[in-house]
């Protein structure tokens, strides 16, 4: 696990103190969203590995929304979000087409 950062000195100016409060809240929000993003992607990949088509497509739809939200808020770059969505989509699509190719 990551070790705790050393405590910084408290700012003297009121604007500095306010900035510290804001940064703490934003850091918590960004950490939470980043965690949701990673969890959503992992859940889709698990469903694909398990071979569950319906669950994978449902989870992919939810993951798309989360990925877009994270990109809009600037937590991850929009190109990274697009790349991850594209890769997940390809995995879900390959899962959906797999039995048809095996039967043909």
Curated annotation (Swiss-Prot):
**Does RNA-binding count among this protein's keywords?**
yes
Is Repressor there in the keyword field?
no
Q: Quote the Gene3D superfamilies the UniProt record gives.
A: Ribosomal protein S20 (1.20.58.110)
Q: Name one GO biological process term.
A: translation
Known Pfam families for this protein?
A: Ribosomal_S20p
Disordered as annotated region, ranges: 1-34
Q: Which UniProt keywords apply?
A: Ribonucleoprotein, Ribosomal protein, RNA-binding, rRNA-binding
One Gene Ontology cellular component: small ribosomal subunit
User: Which residues fall in a compositionally biased region of kind Polar residues?
Assistant: 25-34
Residue ranges annotated as compositionally biased, kind Basic residues, are 1-20
What InterPro entries would the database entry show?
Ribosomal_bS20, Ribosomal_bS20_sf
Q: Which GO terms describe its molecular function?
A: small ribosomal subunit rRNA binding; structural constituent of ribosome
Classify the source by domain of life: Bacteria
Function text: Binds directly to 16S ribosomal RNA.
Q: Which NCBIfam families match?
A: S20
- Tell me the protein family, please: Belongs to the bacterial ribosomal protein bS20 family.
PANTHER family, A to Z: 30S RIBOSOMAL PROTEIN S20 (PTHR33398), SMALL RIBOSOMAL SUBUNIT PROTEIN BS20C (PTHR33398:SF1)
- Write down what this protein is called: Small ribosomal subunit protein bS20
Record the organism: Variovorax paradoxus (strain S110)
């Amino acid at each position: 696990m990551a070790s705790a950062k050393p405590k910084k000195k408290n700012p003297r100016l009121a604007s500095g103190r306010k900035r510290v409060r804001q940064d703490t809240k934003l850091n918590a929000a960004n950490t939470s969203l980043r965690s949701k993003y990673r969890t959503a992607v992992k859940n889709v990949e698990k469903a694909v590995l398990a071979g569950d088509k319906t669950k994978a497509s449902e989870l992919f739809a939810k993951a798309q929304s989360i990925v877009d939200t994270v990109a809009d808020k600037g937590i991850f770059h929009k190109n990274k979000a697009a790349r991850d969505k594209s890769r997940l989509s390809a995995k879900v699509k390959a899962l959906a087409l797999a039995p048809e190719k095996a039967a043909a």
